């Protein structure tokens, strides 16, 4: 059982009870569609297009930092979070959908994890943090990040850039170098049955014994994480074939042992995508705990859709 099991069980128990304090805790009950507003903002000479989802009462607000691939804004997840009192800004990645600029591909491996591209994407996410922070200016709403997969390298860069970021959440975010992650992906070949035939020891040996042959400079997220003191939560799947979970947890434990306020949740049977019905309550509960959401939530009103 992972270290957040007790808080999550408490959260689920709270969600099941319809009490007078329900308005200050996450709820799984269906609610009206949250208000949302489309926005455009600028980053390094291009225009990005996104949507801000605004709950009637807001506990916190997050920028959703997407993973690799030609990803569009995550409106479905944004609605779920808004119904739990968490506002969000989600946007089309540069060069995708309605956003300008050039998408750096391919879908996996090589040049989408170059330091140049990661810095570019972190600049975009930093601009999104500024937009979201300005939207809630004067309301004392904590701003955070939720990074997905590749976002595990991007979000720490954003947090070192912007003092407005107060917490971080990582959905299958690597705490390993880009070289290690690419070597791991080639080793697993993204096959779901990989862990039926290989062990953690074999993975470690493969990562140690196979020198890199990649035409880009390595990026180590630990270098950024060592500079940060804000709270962080990482969610991992034990059967992930895109991110080496065991090594990521080892690095994360070392950071926590040095005094960093970092936590993790491990789902042994989950893959890289995790399970939304489990992961989302864990994220919401942790954010509530981290921002000290007690008493009345911030009543920010609604903007026209």
Annotate the PLM regions:
Residues 111-135:
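Alpha/beta-hydrolase active-site loop
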Residues 25-55:
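N-terminal cap/lid segment of alpha/beta-hydrolase-fold proteins
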Residues 59-67:
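Short beta-strand element of the alpha/beta-hydrolase
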Residues 228, 234-236:
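Short beta-strand/loop motif that positions the catalytic acidic residue
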Residues 77, 230, 244-254:
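Short alpha-helix in the alpha/beta-hydrolase fold that links the catalytic acid
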Residues 161-205:
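Hydrolase active-site cap/lid region
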Residues 270-305:
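Catalytic active-site module of serine/aspartate enzymes centered on a nucleophile-bearing elbow/loop
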Residues 82-105:
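Conserved alpha/beta-hydrolase
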